Amino acid sequence: MAAAVLLAVGLRAARRTLAAAGARGAQVRGNAGVSDGSEVAKAQKAAPGGASPTIFSRILDRSLPADILYEDQQCLVFRDVAPQAPVHFLVIPRKPIPRISQAEEDDQQLLGHLLLVAKKIAQAQGLKDGYRLVVNDGKMGAQSVYHLHIHVLGGRQLQWPPG
């Protein structure tokens, strides 16, 4: 019980930190961990150039906290702060690729690695009956953080078409 309370307090503190980062202009998904349904609006306002640090680059350099599930030399995996399914985590490359449409031929090995890591962590999270991988690209694709990332969602029956 005490451990659960400490975990809840820690998560709330992390979410407040992320919300404060958003107030300072960083790219933040969700509002203190609660989906507010405005991801499309955020995508329309997001800066696509990669000129300023994204929330993901700040998680990579550990200046923002995250619930990290896995990391290696090429990528980092952490839980989404505004989960859209019982299990929802992100796989991001350490290399700052703003959009999947901006990936180069030289990124082929890295992109394959991201997919294999997504599979590995999905299995570790108990998603044996299936899951969904999502990559948003650009404003029309509702990309709200311009650092390539793969959403992995599962833990319930997902619906189709997605929207």
UniProtKB/Swiss-Prot annotation:
Transit peptide: 1-17
GO molecular function term, any single one: adenosine 5'-monophosphoramidase activity
Subcellular location: Mitochondrion
UniProtKB keywords: Acetylation, Apoptosis, Hydrolase, Lipid biosynthesis, Lipid metabolism, Mitochondrion, Nucleotide-binding, Steroid biosynthesis, Transit peptide
Pfam family, one: HIT
Modified residues (N6-succinyllysine): 45, 128
Described purpose of this protein according to its UniProt entry: Exhibits adenosine 5'-monophosphoramidase activity, hydrolyzing purine nucleotide phosphoramidates with a single phosphate group such as adenosine 5'monophosphoramidate (AMP-NH2) to yield AMP and NH2. Hydrolyzes adenosine 5'-O-p-nitrophenylphosphoramidate (AMP-pNA). May be involved in steroid biosynthesis. May play a role in apoptosis.
Protein name: Adenosine 5'-monophosphoramidase HINT2
